[in-house]
Swiss-Prot record:
Pathway field: Carbohydrate biosynthesis; 3-deoxy-D-manno-octulosonate biosynthesis; 3-deoxy-D-manno-octulosonate from D-ribulose 5-phosphate: step 2/3; Bacterial outer membrane biogenesis; lipopolysaccharide biosynthesis
Keyword Cytoplasm: yes
Keywords tagged on the record: Cytoplasm, Lipopolysaccharide biosynthesis, Transferase
Record family assignment: Belongs to the KdsA family.
Enzyme class per UniProt: transferase
Protein name in UniProt: 2-dehydro-3-deoxyphosphooctonate aldolase
Gene Ontology molecular functions: 3-deoxy-8-phosphooctulonate synthase activity
Catalytic activity: D-arabinose 5-phosphate + phosphoenolpyruvate + H2O = 3-deoxy-alpha-D-manno-2-octulosonate-8-phosphate + phosphate
EC numbers, comma separated: 2.5.1.55
Coiled coil regions in record: none
Domain of life: Bacteria
Length: 279
């Protein structure tokens, strides 16, 4: 799959989608995008900047949602233009899709909306690549139905990615089944692993989600060892002060060291192929 000027697939080095959960300010957007770009250029990792203009599915109605679509898209467009990095953001409603698709390079669908047929059709028909997150309630094999819906709308174009972000495991907990990464390959789409939302404890703090940030490297290493096309990680300069999803965000100052390790694992695994795909 051609994505933002590079090739994405299991036979290529992994790409990174990273940035803060939500746009907190213009300055922080540029700070994080610039730092992540510098790291990825040094390590030779294809990079897409991610941040949200609105978090429509916060645990509490009193939680910070973002800067809003107009201001948020303006900031993302400026990051793209001034720093020369492709940008991704999530879209939550059909009527927002045209404006979002005009401003960013890649659209992302929230996991909760993966079964909404009209929404998937509309996002897929936007003309932009789409990262479809697997719902926490969905079996990995069921993502084929979601992808089929998307391909109905985009004429079968090679513009769809699928993303694993953990499965509900009782109340306020998620678990990552690494088999799902191999199973989701059967969609024919590049598979992305979300290493930060996978350690989330949904609603675990009552009015907000908790998280187990210390396990981000554990799951990231495991996913890269399984074999993935891309890695998604939310990162923040100071996660304790993040306005959204701080408990599961990976600290920006620690990003380079983790990515360097993951790059070595990725190269080793992909150099030897995948026995499970041998037939």
């Amino acid at each position: 799959m051609k994505l933002c000027g590079f090739e994405a697939g299991l036979d290529k080095p992994f790409f990174l989608i990273a940035g803060p959960c939500v746009i907190e300010s213009r300055d922080m957007a540029f700070e994080t995008a610039g730092a992540l770009k510098e790291i990825c250029v040094e390590l030779g990792i294809p990079f897409i900047y991610k941040s949200s203009y609105d978090k429509a599915n916060r645990s509490s109605g009193k939680s910070y949602r973002g800067m809003g679509m107009e201001k948020g898209l303006e900031i993302l467009a400026d990051v793209k233009k001034q720093l020369g990095v492709p940008v991704l953001t999530d879209v939550h409603a059909i009527d927002e899709i045209p404006a979002v698709a005009a401003a960013v390079d890649v659209l992302q669908t929230p996991a909760f909306l993966c079964r909404q047929t009209d929404f998937i059709h509309a996002v897929a028909a936007s003309g932009r690549p789409v990262n479809i997150k697997k719902g926490q309630f969905l079996a990995p094999g069921d993502m084929k139905n979601v992808v089929d819906k998307a391909r109905e709308a985009n004429g079968g174009a090679d513009t769809i990615m699928v993303c694993e972000r953990g499965a509900s495991f009782g109340y306020n907990n998620l678990v990552s089944d690494m088999r799902s990464l191999a199973i989701m390959r059967e969609t024919g789409c590049p598979v992305v692993f979300d290493a930060t939302h996978s350690v989330q404890l949904p609603g675990g703090q009552g009015t907000a989600s908790g998280g187990q940030r210390e396990f981000v490297p554990v799951l990231a290493r495991a996913a890269v060892a399984v074999g993935i096309a891309g890695l998604f990680m939310e990162s923040h300069p100071d996660p304790a002060k993040a306005l959204s999803d701080g408990p599961n965000a990976w600290p920006l100052p620690k990003m380079k060291a983790l990515l360097a390790t993951l790059k070595e694992i990725d190269a080793l695994v992909k150099a030897h192929g995948f026995m499970e795909m041998a037939g």
